[in-house]
Each structure stands twice: as C-alpha cells, then as structure tokens.
A protein has these predicted regions:
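Glycine-biased, small-residue-rich flexible motifs in mid-sequence functional cores and linkers
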Residues: 2-5, 82-363
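Short, small/acidic-rich helices and loops at N termini and domain boundaries
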Residues: 1-86, 256, 350, 355-358, ...
Length: 363
C-alpha cells in the first residue's frame, strides 16, 4: 500500500465527524485516502458525505499537517493498516463493519494467526481466574492466539496466561495505543509485554479522546479478529456479552463457561448457554467445535514412536494442564521414572512443560 494513502488516511481519521463507515465510503469511492483528502466538496458529496462532514474536512485541512501527524506516529512506533492491504486481518475484513484503519504496535503478522477471543467480567472470582488460566493455556499450547481487551479481570488474566505460556496475545484497546494513552494504566506494564510477543490494536488515532461509547464499539474488533469468542464469567449487563453478540452477528462461534446459579458474574454466561452458546469445560471443547483437532495432530512429527511406558503416561495427559503430582498418583510410577518419561516425550514434541509442574498433551 502506498505510504501517501496511509499518511492522509491517518489525517482523515483525526476528524471527529468522520466515523469508520464514512472513512470506508471515502476509501471505496476514491480508492485511496490521498485522493479523498485532496477532493473538493462536490466530489466528497458524491462519495456520500454530509455537508457537516465536508465542512469538517475543509476546516481540518487548515489546521492539520498530515506529514507531521505521521511522524508523530512513527516516533511512537505505531504501524497502520488500511483495509484491503496484505497484512490487514482477513477475518476482520469479512465482518459487516470492519475498521478502515487499524493502528498496531508489535507484530502485525499475529493479526492473521488463528485466534480465539477470551472476554469476561472485571469482577473475576477465583473460579473464573482458574477457568481462564486452564482453558487459555490449553488453547495457547495448541498454537492458538488469544484476543481480548486490556481490562482487569478476565481480559487481563487471559492475556497474562497467554504470555506465561509463550503464546501470541492480542489486546484491542478503546484508546490510542501510544504509551501515554494506554488504558487502564494499571495494565500498562502488561501492555508493554504484549507488544514484545503479540500486539496492541486500536482504530483510534493519536490524540483521540477516550469516550465511554468507544468500548462497546471496540468489541466488534475483538470478535472480528477471532474464529470464536469465549465468555468466562459475565453479569447480565457485562460488556463481554456485547462481544458475544458481535460474534453471533459475524457468524462466529460463541462459547461460555457455566457457573453457579448463585453467582452474579455467572448469570450472563449461563444465559448465553440457554440461548445456544456452546458450553465449555476445557480448551478441547473449543478445539473440537472449531474443527482444529485434525490440524493440530498433523503438526507434530509422527515418525517418532513411543515406548509402552510413554504411551501409558500420554493416556493420562490431555489438552488441559495436568500437574506432575496428579500424574504420578494416576500412573502409579516412581517420581524419577515419570520425570524421565516426561523429558523424553517433550523432546519428541508430544507434550509441553508449562512450568510449575504442569504438562499438556500436544497431540
């Protein structure tokens, strides 16, 4: 994609009167944002803009310096993707209202990796935390990227677990993604770690105000980047349910973790299941529903045959983390023997050591 269309697209995106639908109209009508920026009022009207929007563009040309704005973005190490270019996420482009412009910090290639969204309440219980840790770990070791917001609670826990398991985290923000704008500030350090292994994403340019309505609008991107959306703990009015609604509208799978009928943060997830969301008790439920198990099995080297002891141990492992103490009790073998078998199986690519004595089966 030509640099000029990005420079002028970024400038147009700073005009508050132009939302994503109007920007997409300009892109489709003029084919590039540079031509749209230089267009006169008559052509802008033909592109479908209102008189108020046209006046806003005329006024913006007098106060905005597109090249200067672009240089500010480069200094903040922010990449920009325009709908239709090679690295723009293909799943997101399939949705009804894809953002014409995405700002990215980190690895843009991650945006086209197979991903599942994991969202939920800020008021996470211990049950929700454990569910997030175990299910996300199982997805990550099966080479699935995790998409979420950056809110504390389930969102942050999903991203932290992804990082702890050397996965690919994608955080979609409702604010600009330069360091001073990252929100919430309590997760600033988490955001920096995400940039190293995955990416931060937003449709908002530098200097954009963080408004309340940004958050539900942002949720369409979380769902749009993902093959499916998992909700772990959500009350009836939780924003996570908005993400699930977007996923349904985008014809994507919706998954939910059931919870106690006495827990307020399980009312939303239990209701989703009543409405037809797929009940999830482990990461395998998601892998199976998305028809990914066959793909995962072919990824490992099938030429390395296992011994009888190795096969015996593998039978007691699954796609969910199993602690070595539990494994030793199940297989009724000495600790040293089990440790040796696990080491060999990891070398063969059959299992993964998640740390903390936890192991998962890779195929």
């Amino acid at each position: 994609m030509e640099l000029e269309t990005k420079i002028y697209g970024n400038a147009l995106n700073q005009i508050a009167e132009l939302g994503p639908i109007s920007l997409m109209r300009l892109l489709k009508y003029f084919s590039d944002f540079e031509t749209a920026w230089n267009a006169g009022p008559k052509d802008l009207a033909l592109a479908g803009l209102s008189s108020k929007q046209i006046s806003a563009i005329v006024a913006a040309k007098a106060r905005l310096n597109p090249e200067h704005s672009w240089q500010q973005m480069e200094r903040a190490k922010i990449n920009m993707l325009v709908a239709g270019e090679k690295d723009y996420p293909s799943l997101l482009l399939e949705t009804a209202a894809p953002p014409p412009i995405l700002y990215v910090r980190g690895d843009v290639k991650v945006l086209n990796h197979l991903a599942v969204a994991v969202v939920g309440t800020r008021k996470m219980s211990l049950y929700g935390k454990r569910a997030a840790q175990e299910i996300v770990a199982g997805l990550v070791v099966n080479n699935i990227a995790i998409v979420s917001g950056l809110a504390y609670g389930i969102d942050a826990e999903a991203l932290i677990t992804t990082l702890n398991n050397q996965g690919r985290p994608i955080a979609v923000l409702a604010s600009p993604i330069d360091n001073p704008s990252i929100s919430p500030r309590v997760n600033y350090n988490l955001a920096q770690k995400i940039i190293e292994s995955g990416c931060l994403v937003s449709e908002y340019p530098l200097g954009a105000a963080v408004q309340k309505q940004n958050f539900p609008i942002r949720n369409r991107i979380i769902a749009g980047l993902s093959a499916g959306t998992l909700v772990i703990e959500a009350d009836i009015e939780s924003g996570a349910l908005i993400t699930a609604k977007y996923a349904l509208d985008q014809n994507r799978d919706v998954f939910a973790v059931p919870g106690s009928i006495f827990s307020p943060v399980s009312r939303g997830t239990n209701d989703l299941i009543k409405q037809g969301a797929k009940l999830v008790g482990s990461s395998f439920d998601i892998i199976e529903a998305l028809n990914l198990d066959g793909v995962i099995e072919t990824a490992a080297d099938l030429s390395l045959e296992e011994t009888e002891d190795e096969r015996f141990v593998i039978e007691y492992l699954s796609h969910e983390p199993t602690h070595i103490d539990d494994l030793i009790r199940r297989v009724n073998r000495q600790t040293g023997k089990v440790n040796a078998i696990l080491t060999v199986l990891e070398m063969k690519g059959r299992i993964k050591n998640l740390g903390g004595g936890n192991y998962v089966k890779l195929r």
